[in-house]
Amino acid sequence: MLRTKGFSLIELLVVVAIIGALAAVGTLAYNGYVSGARKTAAQNAMQQIGLMQTEYYSIVGEYYGEASCTPSAASTSAINTNLFDGADSIDVEKYWFCVHEETESGSQVGYVVKACNISGDACGSTNLTLNAKGENNF
């Protein structure tokens, strides 16, 4: 009987199936790492906004903030303009930010930085907050 060198069809199919399974697991793991990295970048940006709030307060005498706050592209742009003077900016892929002013009896007592994960054109399910006292829900 003449024996040819090479792999049988079954052996090739097994190898292709194993490579496919490894690729699927690897892709899911990679997407999880990317999502986690974006969330960490958003947390860092929120802390940077908090630091700029301290500087803004020392110059102006009050915190920057909006009476009502829903994270959007416009509110993120307003933060870049008002807190960072356009010299620096926060630009975290897939996240929008806003700053809400906290008041008691009509006077400003602090702020809350809000961030949301963009899902399409609206905020998704991941919402992060950081207040003037450093309390957060990271």
Describe the residue ranges of each PLM region.
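A generic fold-level signal
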Residues: 4, 41, 106-108
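Periplasmic/extracellular, small/polar-rich flexible segments of pilin-like filament-forming proteins
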Residues: 58-138
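N-terminal single-pass transmembrane signal-anchor helix
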Residues: 2-30
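N-terminal hydrophobic or amphipathic segments with adjacent small-residue motifs
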Residues: 11-14, 18-20, 55, 109, ...
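Alpha-helical interaction segments
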Residues: 19-24, 28, 45-47, 53-54, ...
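A generic structural signal for ordered secondary structure
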Residues: 8, 13-14, 41, 45-49, ...
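Membrane-proximal N-terminal amphipathic helix
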Residues: 35-62
